[in-house]
């Protein structure tokens, strides 16, 4: 009796119907948030380059908050430290769900986004460093071009009407999730100027109480929100960037249901509650306060782009991300003898890698941490992030639009449900073959 010939592993496979549906729901929410982000950033850039630019700077630098608690922060700092903690809380929920019940639970499926994210971090950082070996503190910004802005990316997909097939959409989201984990690790390890261990130890108390409550499936807002706020204040006072508190709180929330049944757990429940606040308010407001840079016309743009810091950011996002993600994916396929999923080509991988070069929100945050908000070098970083993200958008649009007809056919196949049982036929065939 002849044994069945083993099949070669497939990259960018579509996964289960439940996981694909969850990814589609998340990307729809991120699309709305991304459009708001783009609108907020556009308003900020236009305002900062009008005769009324001083009023924009005055608003960004307006201080509010109790001075006795060291929380008399500017509105820009509140957006970066406070509102982005909400964004990273959602990222923490996503990360834990992916590792416990999602694609990252399976080492074989996790290998691709993890390797691609690491390549997409290492190569842009290397490109930036090569531009800035001259010293004078510029190397502090090495991590700026390592981030991917998923909300911005999927908003661009919506604007250009590209129908990405499920495998590519899932990869893009999972890549962004791993990217967020790497970004918050970098922020915690490399952008902590001073550390106050007493405050850090004190922060463990509300974090532990929060964890105990959610592990017991107690999720009353009047209990959890004050604990989360207390943890945020203490982490902020410790010297660690306060957004780290958001990730730690997200990690504390259980993913699986306490009754052992399938279905959404507390992490997914909180994600549905908080994501609209993150995508619809936190990230756009941060973008509004972070993106406004006075360019100074064409001469100012040329001056900013003559700075190796800006050049390192632009080439890191445009070239580094593409080479890092596509190159590491090719190496993984070569060493594991894997094939791309049917009807996909390496052009698709390159287009997606270009799209990942849109590094907006976290790149701007790291730029502020590296060089200080409002400094001349931070302004050059903003110009670099904007130019690099726009260039990555243009290149990705050209490649992905070229493949849009093929994508549309794939999406039509993935949506066919001949037996009208609510599950597209292609997923049932995949399950039978698996």
UniProtKB/Swiss-Prot annotation:
It is found in: Cell membrane. Its main location: membrane. Keywords: Antiport, Cell membrane, Ion transport, Membrane, Sodium, Sodium transport, Transmembrane, Transmembrane helix, Transport. It is a multi-pass membrane protein. It comes from the Bacteria. One of its GO terms (cellular component) is plasma membrane. It catalyses: Na(+)(in) + 2 H(+)(out) = Na(+)(out) + 2 H(+)(in). GO terms for molecular function: sodium:proton antiporter activity. The chain crosses the membrane at residues 34-54, 73-93, 111-131, 141-161, 171-191, 194-214, 233-253, 278-298, 313-333, 346-366, 380-400. InterPro entries: Na/H_antiporter_dom_sf (IPR023171), NhaA (IPR004670). GO terms for biological process: regulation of pH. NCBIfam families: NhaA. Belongs to the NhaA Na(+)/H(+) (TC 2.A.33) antiporter family. HAMAP family: NhaA. Na(+)/H(+) antiporter that extrudes sodium in exchange for external protons. This is Na(+)/H(+) antiporter NhaA 1.
